[in-house]
């Protein structure tokens, strides 16, 4: 009965759901600037009868329905990366275009595409009485520049609530995902001595010192591709140099400092301490005093001025296939569309790195679209999936209550 009623409501609101997505994609939300898009989402939640709608101290938008003992969070980050050169898009990156039932726009799949389904789905669940003994939160947050910082503040600061379960709306191709690799961001700095390039031999070129490290980083990544750190579900770890910078007096001077930045992807087969020790082990003994490894921290203020310093270590996580949350997700899919679907994991990182990785809160992922299109100038999401996702988000709380009575 609930399934059919949900489907009726979703189909009746198909146009509203699609229009809502188009409108929030058309509002740029770069660099964590969420106020305008948050206001638009908040207005929709108010219209649909959410019990509480407000911004938190960081500037994320919150919507609550119910006040039961079981607390569920639907997590959808609503900030986006930039668009690069707009001329490479062929259409307005934010207003986008709809072609063959697909919306092409920045944020369409990463990750504004899950927001309409979550917001409408929860409102339908409320109308149909499917949230008995449940408090359900929609959490539209900033994530692109520091995975997990928003949920960390959600638990520890505002609203200061530790949920029992989390559903992450990152794209999963309408399958159930339950984890991903972790990562750590590191900075390696080599110091030298400046000199005029005409007499460079009087200096000590910091770039040359780093060359051996860069070569070893590339070799380390190659060894990982051959099985080092492999995990049977999460796959292979990796490492890459992602940025460099030099400090030099001028273009005709020897640099006295050279810095590289590393992105190290981590599986559950590895530990944080092992990974850091591994990187430090790349430094030759004779350069131990001249090359230093530093773990990065994020301490930039949000658009509201809120500062929440965190390490840029993002743990890997994986929820067991037999966990009641996983089973509730699979049962929801089966009830709605017949048959369970293959479980998966993301290649990229999500807010699950805090929810599940740091806080140990059971989490799963379900969302429309394919992550392969994230951060590209072909970013896209099938509108049929955006609409159908609302069915999942509406029914899921009821199916979860049957798994964790």
Where are these regions (language model features)?
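Short, flexible, mixed-charge acidic loops at enzyme active sites
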Residues: 84-96, 181-185, 304-309
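Buried hydrophobic packing segments
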Residues: 41, 115-125, 151-154, 210-213, ...
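Acidic/His- and Gly-rich active-site-bordering loop/insert found
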Residues: 2-104, 127-132, 370
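Residue-level signal for inorganic ion chemistry
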Residues: 24, 28, 170, 210, ...
